[in-house]
Amino acid sequence: MTVKLTIDCMGGDHGPSVTVPAAVNFVRSHADAHLMLVGIESAIRAQLKKLKAADNPALTVVSASEIVAMDDPVEVALRKKKDSSMRVALNRVKDDEAQACISAGNTGALMAVSRYVLKTLPGIERPAIAFALPNPTGYTTMLDLGANVDCEPQHLLQFAEMGHALVAAVEGKERPSIGLLNIGEEVIKGNDIIKRAGELLRTSTLNFRGNVEGNDIYKGTVDVIVCDGFVGNVALKTSEGLAQMLSDIIKEEFGRSWLTKVMAVLALPVLLRFKKRVDHRQYNGAALLGLRGLVIKSHGSADAYAFEWAIKRGYDAVKNGVLERLARAMEENAGSLEQAKRDAGGPGSASQMASPIAGPVSGQPAEPYSAQSSKA
């Protein structure tokens, strides 16, 4: 089976200078992949010519006349730039011409346009950004990592349901364990939203293990960690910064003198393994869960190596049938999610009415909602 992916070539800080080389490298190592490169045609073809890939049959150029800038407000991306590379790429997924879309574009815009074009799965009010972070024995899936900076308790329950379905589908675990990220393990800890979310999770059918703390993220304490997008994004960026700092310190220390340089040569195999394990670029690419189509969000600052990993995330998700399995799980749990929403106050509650991001369950926002224009 050919895996067809669309690439938003104009998204991110570097546009085609990063996305096109990444796409070219990817198809050279994945014979069953076909990538549609969406964006300003002249810019894409110039990169393909430079890389001697202009005639590669695994690459198709799809023209789009507009670009969603990293600092564009959501309203501009959704209402005005209807021929943007981001939207055209997502439309290909909606029309079943591609199986997933990969973009390094503005997070808020990508979330809004994806939700408008693809709609959400039954029972899901807000999609969430999810990714599997390494731990000593495998991976811990964490969500949300930046799509929703403010959440209601029922949204955190929905994130837990999606995380459960994702881990069950990809890792084959029958009952993945769930943890709620908090400032302490005790039930009394946290703000009101976290406490209410904990109550919903405890009464759900999920394998909820209670609150977890920041130091549990990389321990493998639970299979899935749930949090709002503000906390998740800060935790993710902090982790990446720490990994980079450790690499820089080791490089600096081994370069201090001729003796330490000799020691570095002797320790080279270990250092190379360490560098590979802490290189955050290979963990680039997070899925937007809860949509009726696969969307992978890359860091806006990603280089070609990192963006190639984001493409691989989309490729692997298609291969593993993640969307189909997630949709099936959400359909099975739709009743419990609806009950949780009523328990939390329902769509008519003051807290939800005050949140312009919420929109109807169908996934079609009545008005474009505001979100961060982050480079997450």
Curated annotation (Swiss-Prot):
GO terms for biological process: fatty acid biosynthetic process; phospholipid biosynthetic process. Pathway: Lipid metabolism; phospholipid metabolism. Residues 334-376 are annotated as: Disordered. Gene3D superfamilies: Isopropylmalate Dehydrogenase (3.40.718.10). It comes from the Bacteria. It is an enzyme of class 2 (transferase). Signal peptide: none annotated. Its main location: cytoplasm. Keywords: Cytoplasm, Lipid biosynthesis, Lipid metabolism, Phospholipid biosynthesis, Phospholipid metabolism, Transferase. Its EC number is 2.3.1.274. One of its GO terms (cellular component) is cytoplasm. GO terms for molecular function: phosphate:acyl-[acyl carrier protein] acyltransferase activity. It catalyses: a fatty acyl-[ACP] + phosphate = an acyl phosphate + holo-[ACP]. It is found in: Cytoplasm. InterPro entries: FA_synthesis, Phospholipid_synth_PlsX-like. Catalyzes the reversible formation of acyl-phosphate (acyl-PO(4)) from acyl-[acyl-carrier-protein] (acyl-ACP). This enzyme utilizes acyl-ACP as fatty acyl donor, but not acyl-CoA. HAMAP family: PlsX. Belongs to the PlsX family. Homodimer. Probably interacts with PlsY. This is Phosphate acyltransferase.
